[in-house]
Amino acid sequence: MSCRKPANYRYGEHTADVLVQAFGCTLEEAFKNAAVALADLTYYSERVEPRMAKKVEVEYDDLEGLLFKWIDELLFLFDAEKFAWGRNIEVELRQGVGYRISATLHGEMYDINKHGFTGLIVKAMTFHMMEIKKVDDYWVLQYVVDI
């Protein structure tokens, strides 16, 4: 599917935090790009090889809560398990009573010598300035993380 999204993601200026805007032709693609943007804040995701896979499932009543839980779960994967995911991410989003993401992230254990370090450590996800909207033919997921 082709659309006129401006990029996969971009960062914005924000004091002591980082504002992230992730884009996608579909909500699934936007959630995937939100995960890649999060990774690229700390390490270089293009250096990650798909040596193992991690399943992630999150659900919430609304899309904003789902985005919060998605990013929060990914932070846990990196902080607690030292799992570095690359750009190969499969995301399935389902809507029923609420919303549910079932995803598979391909990656490997984080190695600073291989994956590098950008100098930023993401501490937490916030609800500050969170926004999810459809613009023309693409989706925008905006969120802020504490660094």
UniProtKB/Swiss-Prot annotation:
Residues at which Ca(2+) binds: 17, 146-147
Keyword Glycoprotein: no
Gene3D superfamilies xref list: Archease domain
InterPro entries: Archease, Archease_arc, Archease_dom, Archease_dom_sf
Keywords assigned by UniProt, alphabetized: Calcium, Metal-binding, tRNA processing
GO terms assigned for molecular function: calcium ion binding
GO biological process, one term: tRNA splicing, via endonucleolytic cleavage and ligation
Keyword Lipoprotein applies: no
Domain of life of the source: Archaea
HAMAP family given in the database record: Archease_arch
PANTHER family found in the cross-reference section: ARCHEASE, PROTEIN ARCHEASE
Family of the protein in this entry: Belongs to the archease family.
Function: Activates the tRNA-splicing ligase complex by facilitating the enzymatic turnover of catalytic subunit RtcB. Acts by promoting the guanylylation of RtcB, a key intermediate step in tRNA ligation. Can also alter the NTP specificity of RtcB such that ATP, dGTP or ITP is used efficiently.
Protein name: Protein archease
Organism: Pyrobaculum calidifontis (strain DSM 21063 / JCM 11548 / VA1)
Taxonomic lineage from the root: Archaea, Thermoproteota, Thermoprotei, Thermoproteales, Thermoproteaceae
